[in-house]
Amino acid sequence: MTTVRTLPIRVPPVAGEALDSWLEALAHRSATAFGDLLAAVGLNPYHGTATNGWIVALTSEQASAITAATAVSRDALTTMTLAHYSGRAVNIHPETPTLKRAFPWGNARGSRYCPTCMKDNGGRWQLSWRLGWSFACTEHHRLLVDVCPRCCAVPRRRTHVGDLIPNIGCCAHPAPQANGRIPARCDA
C-alpha cells in the first residue's frame, strides 16, 4: 500500500451514513473523480467486483489509511460498514470481507432509500437501507424506494463509477439508451 496523505478538505459523515456514501460526498466536495479519491484514502478503486469488500468491512490497513487521510476515527468508520451489524443483522466471513448468505434477511442487493431523507440530508445514503429487512422509513413513515424511478435500476448495486465525480443523491447507473465507455449517468 502506498503512503496516504492527509486530505485538505473535510466532510463529516452524517449519522448512520454508509461508507461509500460518505466517500462519494467527500469526492463531490473535493471535485475529484471517485476512483482518484479511493486511491487517495488507500482503497483500491478498481477491485473488479460489483460491490467492494470495504462496504462490508474494512481491513485494519484500510481503516488506518482512511483515518490518516480524513481524521475520521476507526470506530466511526466501522459504524459506516455492514460490520456494524455483524452478528445482529448480518454475518461476515472472518477471513474475507464478504457476507454469509445463510443469515436470513441480512443484506439486500443494492440499497433502498427514502427520497425525503435524501432531500433532507443532501443526498447521503443510510447504511441501514442496505439491510434486507429494512423496508420503511421510521422518520417519514413511508416505504423505502427500491428502484430508480427513471432507469429502473437497483440503487447502489455497484460502487460509483471511478472516472466520474459523484453527483451525490442521484442515480449513478447509465442513463437509458446511453452508450460509450463512460455513458451518461441517469442522475434521477
Name these PLM-found stretches.
Residues N107-G110, R130-W133, H141-V145, L164-I168:
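Short metal-coordination and nucleic-acid-contact micro-motifs, chiefly zinc-binding Cys/His arrays
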Residues Y113-T116, E139:
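SIR2/sirtuin NAD+-dependent deacylase catalytic core
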Residues T6, V145-A188:
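Domain-exit/linker segments immediately C-terminal to small folded modules
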Residues L37, A50, V90, E95, ...:
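Generic alpha-helical propensity signal that fires on short helical segments
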